[in-house]
């Protein structure tokens, strides 16, 4: 009863009633839903295109009185570049009104056929002849523009990619102080950093001289720059006379007047060129005052205005003399120790240095802006072409079409999507990894930091990250702290700064009004936590409230002094981190591993949502886009495995197609299953079909397994894991993996390759599963080395003997020289063929030049869990399976239930992640149900208020981060679980159970913690790592085997291993390893021969690497000779002839093209 009565409040998922029931322990009512988790990608791209969705958002924002940009991204660039004038200014070309035609191919066709999902872009171009006033207007095609899918991805050449948002230093003016090493004095410096163009840097050094650095060149006195800008010595003294530093600088400055100063600057910037006044003037103009060369961007102008108290309009993208004066003034005031001043606009401004790692000074460049910058470079290259063509072509014959060359624009867009560091192959391991990938914030990439140069400060957690970037989720390793994840409630404002929402507090009264604040706005306020106790009148219950102030300081203040309050306890963490139950009990380092490992979980054959969730499961799965959601409300009309048809309330029909066993980027299986029935009433946004790793529309990355924390015969030493055979035989942790194999038939110099069943020297049983085209049939079971697609390649014509010519004449072309280049299943792979795609040039398919046919074969394999696979919980508790026990050997509860998995209790205390222990207790409670509806204890009262006092067995529960089940609630509930049919409770109120040894039937001496934990199977599967080689490819130069599984390489017997054999005196073993097993080319062929013929192994020869060493020494002009034991010179082989001779005598076919380098593989 309680559960259903309270389903809507207890259901901490979305407000819509479509989410499955999940009883929540949350005590805090949140005034705000989690926003759309993909908005970061989609809204930015909408702005770039200027589509209807963006226009609607702008209108509603303007109505509500917000200041938002009213120009779309592409519109901005076309306006920026227009007009393109020729050198004399007699003709010009302008662009306006861009529009898109519908894309040529659908998303699925693009994935299938390796196309890019793009729409043709058209622009109206007007050519004006200024002398005659004649205007010619034309619509010009500007190339295909890649479009974003509704999931926030791009399909480029058939693969899904994500453009990651970049975290960069915002343009603006920055003041900094550092201590001089020699004199211990503070050195103050200022930098004006534009969005593009030359930096202007100033500093006051230890001698109190104010210097300026123009465009990273040598330092000069700042007064030289002021004089060059037209100021006289008197004006400088009048403005800056009260500051000792400026007076001293002026005295040291020997330039006389503007001309002298300009020439002085020119000499420093362009040493070796003859200085003239005009050239110097132009140089300075071009550096800082020419909008084509210098741009602060709106955000830079906004930051400069804010810092210096100026009132320039936001579209003033170049510096003004006033900006330079104000910067110098601010710097000398900072040096003089003043703390506040009045800006040009009359505003009071604080004089202080800036913190570069503060999120008020770092901004996000998201997809729209990154692509916009790329298009801008392309258009700038095109502009040069247009100018040249204007001068060379006949004025009468010119039309916009003849002037414009779209190649550079198309090339720069293609280059960005194909090769930029920020355009990444999408992580599609499971829906969460895709979602997190799209919400990633990356400080690397062009214009960002580099791994090597990034110090500790940039990587560290900063107080201004709160509610903006997750402090937990970041990679381990060299990128730690440089790659982050957007916090759950964060959003990006028009300037690119991350905003986070806060509830307004008015005179101690907490309201439901929400304000979004950027990091530097937030610094002015006093902010209370989300869990601050509130009375029924929405005022703070305690006299003093714990708050944060600027710079992360914590303080207690009266309720009336509080300005804002957090909207939600999970405000500071990202989506993945918010899915860790009892996060508040885990050490941050382990939580980081937990958040990262959830992204590596493999979708299982049957998904199961967690018994213990956090209420974030529904929203994350729904927004990730791997489930099918209803676009409109209506009724389900028809359901099958492949599609769902709905009749909508407005009279229209929609058919939703489902993906069946298609391959993700990571080779996991993407399969959607219907969860509605015909005749069901549906509402907009309801989940109609589950995707991979989702159940009933909730994220379901793993399985709920019965865990016991106990040592077992030492098999779970060092985080190893013991599993029950049940998980293997019932396919509890089995997953499906799909591999794609591709082969193409090309035109070669000797003739075309052919896909055929007619392969030389191959027996009929090998071809049994190939159809008449030579392509394997669907449903065939294949193992390593089986032929998937038969293909022959013409071999070079050799001189024929008369007998062969006779045979040719009699039997026709049959004996023609071809060699077998069929596509075979690679080593270590096995599975069932589930799909074949054939593309043929003759049937009109677009294929790359020189390719006549292309065949793709999809092989699926079911991987059961096995020893060596890696499992993990959600708390960073990971381990490798060491042993799979028979069910009858596993420890069992008093009612005979065997546990599924045994973990080592020693893995908990030192790792400081007891969240996993609380999870097993709550998991047990959820599986058994409880009833505390009549109790008077304080903890039970809390549960009665939120409707979590009576729960049926097997009900999913939610314990949201920082607002979940308390320890006293768990302890109390363990005493009131619903007993089994014998009236017994298997787990004692302590949370431990009496377990019995499955082998002897004896009880273990102590009670053992038992409960349900959510276990993930990670993508580190032992089948993908196992590898063995007999013969295979060799490196071109050293002739040694390649390394690594991908190259089918050998195991390196390294320096230290050699020492070990030397220590044992195993001379022959060592000699074999260094010669015939590695790079003695002749020797290894002869050994093959001896083994084939059953003879003794011959003497090893000279290793190839020795010859390489000698060649290297010869290249350094050292003549090295090799002498035998009797002092005779030994000839070194320079050709491979004798190898081929030996091989031919043996009948070993060396013509089979083994890849000879890593590149070729």
UniProtKB/Swiss-Prot annotation:
Q: Name one GO cellular component term.
A: DNA-directed RNA polymerase complex
Listed under GO biological process in this entry are: DNA-templated transcription
- Enzyme Commission code(s) on record: 2.7.7.6
Catalytic activities: RNA(n) + a ribonucleoside 5'-triphosphate = RNA(n+1) + diphosphate
- For the keyword Transferase, the answer is yes
Q: Does the keyword Nucleotidyltransferase apply?
A: yes
Write down the Gene3D superfamilies for this protein, in alphabetical order: 2.40.50.100, 2.40.50.150, 3.90.1100.10, DNA-directed RNA polymerase, beta subunit, external 1 domain, DNA-directed RNA polymerase, subunit 2, domain 6, RNA polymerase alpha subunit dimerisation domain, RNA polymerase Rpb2, domain 2
The top EC class, named as a word, is transferase
Ordered alphabetically, the record's keywords are: DNA-directed RNA polymerase, Nucleotidyltransferase, Transcription, Transferase
> What GO MF annotations does this protein's record show?
DNA binding; DNA-directed RNA polymerase activity; ribonucleoside binding
Q: Which NCBIfam families match?
A: PRK00405.1, rpoB
Assembly description: The RNAP catalytic core consists of 2 alpha, 1 beta, 1 beta' and 1 omega subunit. When a sigma factor is associated with the core the holoenzyme is formed, which can initiate transcription. The RNAP complex including the principal sigma factor HrdB also interacts with RNA-binding protein RbpA.
Q: Which family does it belong to?
A: Belongs to the RNA polymerase beta chain family.
| HAMAP family assigned to the protein according to its UniProt record, in alphabetical order | RNApol_bact_RpoB
> What is the protein's known function?
DNA-dependent RNA polymerase catalyzes the transcription of DNA into RNA using the four ribonucleoside triphosphates as substrates.
Name of the protein: DNA-directed RNA polymerase subunit beta
Record organism: Streptomyces coelicolor (strain ATCC BAA-471 / A3(2) / M145)
